[in-house]
Amino acid sequence: MPSLKDLKNRIASVKATQKITKAMKMVAAAKLRRAQEAAEAARPYSQRMGAVLANITAAVSDADGAPLLMTGTGKSDVHLLVVCTAERGLCGGFNSQIARFARDHVRKLLAEGKTVKIFTVGKKGYDILRREYASLIIERKELRDVKRVGFENADALGKRIIEMFEAGEFDVCTLFYSEFKSVISQVPTGLQLIPASAPAVVEEDAAHKGAVYEYEPDAASILADLIPRNISVQIFRALLENVAGEMGSKMSAMDNATRNAGEMINKLTLSYNRQRQAQITKELIEIISGAEAL
C-alpha cells in the first residue's frame, strides 16, 4: 500500500498533468476554429475547379492531344499512395485511422499483384507505416517547421508528384487524408490524383445551366495548365482538412484526458483521506491504550 507521502506526490503529479491537458485543449480549440474556417473556405473553390475540369474533360475526352496527366499511361501496374497525416501525436486515433485506411488499400493492391510505392506527408504517418511497409516508402515529407499550411506547401508536393509521374515512376497516384466533418468525426478519404479522373458532375446554378462554352486557344491546352494546378488545389484542401481534423481530435482527446485526470485525483484523494483517517484512528487508540495502562 502506498504511503501518505507517495499518495500526496501522485496527486500533485496528476494535478500538474491536468493543467497541461486543459491548456492543450484550449489551444487546440483556438486553432480548430481557424483551421475549420480555412478548410470550409477551400471547399467551394476546390469543388468549382472540379466542375470546370469535368466540363473541359468532356470536351476533349474523345479528342487527340489530351494531356498525359488526364489519360494516364494506359496501365495501372504501379501505384503511388500519398498518405497525409499530422506531424505530432496526442490527437486520439486521428493518425492511426488514416494509416489504417491506407494500409488496407496497400494490402488490396498487393493482393491484386500491383506494385505499391508510398509517399508519406507528416511524421506520424511515416512512423506508423514504416513498421510494416518500410521497403515501400520511397519518399517522405515533413511540415514540422510550417506554422500555417499554405498553398505553396501543397504546390511543392504537387510538382514533386508530377515530376515523379513524368519520370515514369508510377501509373496511378491516390491521395489519402482525413475529411473533417465535426470535432468528433473525421472520415478517412482516398482521392485519385493521377490520372486526373473527371470529378462527379456538380449541379450548375441557374445562371450557368445550359451554357455553351468555348475554349481559347483550345480545351486540351487549357487542361494541360489546369490539371497540375488542380492537383495542387486538391492537395491543399486535403492538408487543410487534415489540420482541422487533427485539432478537433486533439481537443477531444485533451478533454477526455482532463476529465480522466479529475476522476483519478478524486480517487487518489479519497484513498489519501481514508488512509490518513485510519492512521489518526490508530494513533488515538495507541494514546488511549497508553493512558489506561498508567
Swiss-Prot record:
Q: Where does this polypeptide localize?
A: Cell inner membrane
Query: What is the protein name given in its UniProt record?
Result: ATP synthase gamma chain
The UniProt entry's sequence similarity note says:
Belongs to the ATPase gamma chain family.
Q: Which gene encodes it?
A: atpG
| Record text on subunit structure and interactions | F-type ATPases have 2 components, CF(1) - the catalytic core - and CF(0) - the membrane proton channel. CF(1) has five subunits: alpha(3), beta(3), gamma(1), delta(1), epsilon(1). CF(0) has three main subunits: a, b and c.
Q: Which Pfam families match?
A: ATP-synt
Please provide the record's keywords in A-Z order: ATP synthesis, Cell inner membrane, Cell membrane, CF(1), Hydrogen ion transport, Ion transport, Membrane, Transport
Alphabetized GO MF terms: ATP binding; proton-transporting ATP synthase activity, rotational mechanism
Q: Which GO terms describe its cellular component?
A: plasma membrane; proton-transporting ATP synthase complex
Concerning PROSITE patterns, the annotation shows: ATPASE_GAMMA
Q: Name one GO biological process term.
A: proton motive force-driven plasma membrane ATP synthesis
InterPro entries per record: ATP_synth_F1_ATPase_gsu, ATP_synth_F1_gsu, ATP_synth_F1_gsu_CS
Q: Which domain of life is it from?
A: Bacteria
